[in-house]
Design a protein with these regions (language model features):
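Detector for C-terminal structural segments
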Residues: 16, 60, 83-84, 233-243, ...
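N-terminal lobe/hinge region of extracytoplasmic solute-binding protein
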Residues: 56-116, 147, 222
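Gly/Pro-rich hinge or "lid" segments in bacterial periplasmic/extracellular proteins
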Residues: 78, 86-89, 94-101, 194-265, ...
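Aromatic-rich, solvent-exposed beta-strand/loop patch
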Residues: 108-116, 132, 161, 179-202, ...
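Aromatic- and charge-enriched surface segment that lines or borders ligand/interaction sites
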Residues: 109-155, 171, 177-179, 275-278, ...
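Surface-exposed binding/hinge segments that line
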Residues: 124, 158-209, 226-228, 233, ...
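Ligand-site clamp/hinge motif
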Residues: 126, 215, 247-300, 341, ...
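Extracellular/periplasmic solute-recognition and catalytic clefts
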Residues: 149, 156, 167-168, 230-242, ...
Length: 646
């Protein structure tokens, strides 16, 4: 706590100095409180030459880009989150983040099953949708995209497509018949958005038909959303988008009859300290991911900044993806369950929580996030099975004391008065429990598969060479995962492993995950938004495994399991509301936990503040028309509701 307070004090002093010297691109005194009272300053210009009060500025979540001119959504490592998939691309079906239900976007309605076994569907397209170059979006674009998937083996999506799709045809200009290789009752979830985005990015046939889809950069991109590409920084730090004159001819225009600000700028200003200072100086309207310490600085230095919650705990705890450590499970030694379990048991999860986000995290032993809706259906009901679960040697690894231990730690730090009073409420806050911190059992598991220790207590591989682990981590983006990597490396180092962290830019980080060219990584492959978890976990099927070095259509961890595959094959056949769905999904999660297919650790706590100097009506906990998912595909619908300060 003392270190935290010291850091805040330093940042506050630093912010006073920098804001006093701030460039005139944006005012440091907004003249308005968080209630949106006074009008925004007029006449100010941004550094890209647009009126500040007409330009919504977002922090670029994934930092500086290595290939800023690559807009091909089907290439490994492409940066989707700089406005590209949020407001330029669009989807057949998107998701309402309040209800978790899908709705038709580019499609005119949800798909219609044409038979009782869910192998044939009719897809009706919304009429009057146009690409920003004036060409109408029709079934020709859908057919062209699907055919490109099927014909191009070098695309990562190809493996999934040939397994899933039997045939397709254009019935007319706005109707497609889509046939699957086997029953697919969740077809809209398989091709549409359930969380962040989807598989299906329509390709404009008139642009792509003479291009190689594996190498074409699609620059400048032709957009189907309500914004069009304006310009991008060749150094990869910013991208500017401009509202289309014909925004009514988009899904957002037709559905909401609204558009959004005239300009939207995604800008990466650098380190977290610089990002915080930019918001204090009113040079950024939306920050996408900061630390608890930085949130405290903002609340102290600005009266026009607020987070999801106006006060403590500020963050939204229900991001539908969880954080932890992934491995390439096809490569030695991570292909052995004993090694993965040893690393889990050698992780001091309480210290990792404190070192990552000051303990403000909800723990998860299962392969789906502990968001309220998911924890209610899976984490809480499965506690008894977790307690009864044993490894092959009879060892019971589950520890339900995490909640009380964390409460005690906070009480010792003098902040226990802010905690809930009951055990049930503490579980809602901190989670149901995790695995024991048991280095003796971890050592036993390693020794069982030939690992040894040298005289200094350092672990050696079975061939006698030193064991080192390099953990891929986001550099200057996705701060929770970046911090988690260092905290985990610290635990493993104390256990005698030469563990280190390898910070990476977004392009390299995601490319190495897709191609399996990593041994360990602070990734987040466990996502779900409700009881129907199969659509978000189906990619773990072993049929999607490809050799290391090739982009994977799914199962980037390359985890092979006949048991998991068998449960998934059954899950694929049932509908979302079938009672067997939760039963089979529970079995799937328990099997994944037993195999330790990756090491899930925490739900994601998102500190995503907004600045109300120039714009208002952001979604918040008390204005809950959408979640604070600025980096999701449905941001195009959120931004249509964000209003300029009048």
């Amino acid at each position: 706590m003392k270190h935290r307070q010291w850091l805040i004090a330093v940042l506050v002093v630093f912010s006073l100095v920098v804001s006093a010297c701030a460039a005139p691109a944006a005012p440091t005194d907004s003249g308005a409180g968080s209630d949106g009272g006074a009008a925004a300053p007029a006449g100010e210009m941004t550094f890209v030459g647009t009126p500040r009060n007409e330009t919504l500025i977002l922090d670029n979540l994934n930092g500086s880009l290595e290939r800023p001119e690559n807009f091909n959504p089907y290439t490994p490592g492409v940066e989707m989150g700089r406005g590209y998939h949020e407001i330029c691309l669009d989807n057949l079906w998107d998701v309402d983040t309040v209800t978790g239900e899908q709705f038709p976007a580019l499609a005119a309605e949800m798909p219609t099953p044409l038979n009782d076994d869910y192998t044939s569907f009719e897809i009706k397209l919304r009429e009057g949708i146009y690409w920003d170059d004036g060409v109408e979006f029709t079934s020709d674009d859908v057919i062209f995209t699907l055919q490109t998937w099927m014909d191009t083996e070098a695309l990562a999506i190809h493996g999934w497509a040939v397994d899933y799709i039997a045939s397709f045809e254009a019935v007319d200009k706005y109707t497609v018949q889509f046939n699957t290789t086997r029953p697919q009752p969740r077809m809209a979830k398989d091709l549409g958005v359930t969380i962040w985005d989807n598989r299906f990015y329509p390709m404009a046939k008139h642009i792509w038909e003479n291009q190689d889809p594996t190498t074409y950069e699609y620059f400048p991109p032709v957009c189907i959303g309500q914004y069009k590409f304006s310009k991008t920084d060749p150094n990869g730090n910013w991208t500017l988008w401009e509202l289309r004159d014909d925004w009514e001819r988009t899904s957002v225009g037709q559905i909401t009859e609204k558009s959004g600000p005239k300009y939207i700028l995604w800008n990466f200003v650098g380190t977290e300290e610089k990002r915080i200072l930019a918001m204090i100086a009113n040079d950024v309207d939306i920050l996408q991911d900061i630390t608890p310490e930085s949130m405290e600085v903002l609340t102290q230095r600005s009266d026009v900044v607020r987070a999801w919650h106006a006060g403590f705990p500020y963050a939204d705890f229900d991001d539908p993806c969880e954080r932890g450590i992934s491995f390439n499970n096809s490569e030695f030694p991570y292909d052995q369950w004993q090694v993965r379990w040893a690393l889990a048991l050698a992780t001091d999860i309480k210290n990792v929580s404190l070192g990552t986000f000051a303990g403000m995290l909800r723990v998860s032993p299962l392969g789906v996030p502990p968001v309220a809706a998911v924890q209610k259906v899976y984490h809480k009901p499965l506690v008894e099975r977790l307690q009864a679960m044993t490894l092959p040697d009879g060892y019971a690894p589950f520890d339900s004391s995490f909640v009380l231990d964390m409460a005690k730690i906070f009480q010792e730090q003098g902040v226990g008065g802010d905690l809930p009073a009951t055990d049930a409420e503490l579980i809602d806050l901190f989670g149901v429990g995790w695995w024991k911190y048991d280095t003796e059992q971890a050592a036993k598991l390693l020794e069982d598969v030939g690992f040894t220790r040298n005289a200094d207590g350092k672990w050696l591989l079975p061939d006698g060479t030193p064991w080192s682990i390099s953990i891929n981590a986001p550099s200057d983006f996705e701060v929770q995962s970046g911090r988690l990597a260092y905290a985990v490396a610290d635990s493993w180092s104390k256990f005698g492993i030469d563990a280190s962290v390898k910070p990476m830019t977004a392009n390299t980080f995601w490319t190495e995950q897709a191609t399996g060219q990593f041994e360990a990584g602070s990734y987040w492959p466990g996502c779900a938004i409700g009881a129907d978890i199969y659509p978000n976990l189906s990619g773990w099927h072993q049929k999607f495994i490809v050799p290391t070095g090739e982009p994977a259509p799914g199962n980037v961890n390359r985890h092979a399991s006949d048991e998991i595959a068998a449960i998934m094959d059954e899950l694929e056949k049932v509908t979302s509301n079938d009672p067997r769905n939760v039963e089979l999904s529970s079995d799937l999660l328990m099997q994944m936990a037993l195999e330790m297919h990756w090491i899930p650790m925490f739900g994601t706590s998102k500190f995503v503040p907004v600045n109300e100097t120039y714009f208002t009506n952001y979604p918040t906990a008390d204005n809950y028309y959408e979640g604070p998912w600025w980096w999701w595909s449905n941001f195009k619908f959120i931004v249509a509701n964000i209003q300029p300060k009048q």
